[in-house]
């Protein structure tokens, strides 16, 4: 029962993350770089800091978390900065492919590589940890089935691209470009997988038994998102200067509206990793699911992003065969979340 509860919590977080682009559509008169970094203040700084504080027991301070973990802190933030590059290209993948297909390919690549790269790199830096032992047959099988589901959805996307006229493509996704979007989505997925690598390096940054299991991932999550914020801030502020959009932040008439929806978008985005930490607290009896939890989160993100894609009519005009392939991919992804428990 605890495992089911853990998976349900992760699923709720995935649903929230897949919904985070809905409030962004309500933002008015701000350029992309302006609203992206403002929502990032909530998603990558404020809320992760509040989450990390939950890992600090009474009588201790936040900064005690990092005592004796200098190398781990540095590596966690470094991979957070690399993940930040993935976040930037992630947005471009949805620009050219739409929410459903863009998230599917990027998150699928992220799921597979993120799950595998963590133990591999930990084994290089800390061979005594024997991190590679966590990559069991069940874990690898779960990753393979997840990637199979992503591939099926990718086939649906290719079928969509070949069956629609240019006018229909533009009506569904304004800047639709499958080859360009696919390249960017694969890059975004590779770099985004660094998030889980950062979590792996920061897995010991907590107060041991004094920190409840469900909160132990939150300090590392904060460090990763701080690293990502740095990368995104550099790029967004550069774009503010290049495009002369610094004035966006001074538009008082839209300030309240935009801050509200940026905060909502940030909260929905962060909820996936808050939910991941809470959910893992219920998965401690299953080492396989603990290792595969990031992959499960990404798979469920893809499932819900495609549900939103259908709601937002991004698949409008596609044949019933294309929709059937899409649904098959979604079913395979859901199946992949439970498969490791049956192997």
Give the label of every model feature segment:
Residues 1-343:
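Polytopic alpha-helical membrane proteins, predominantly small-molecule transporters/carriers
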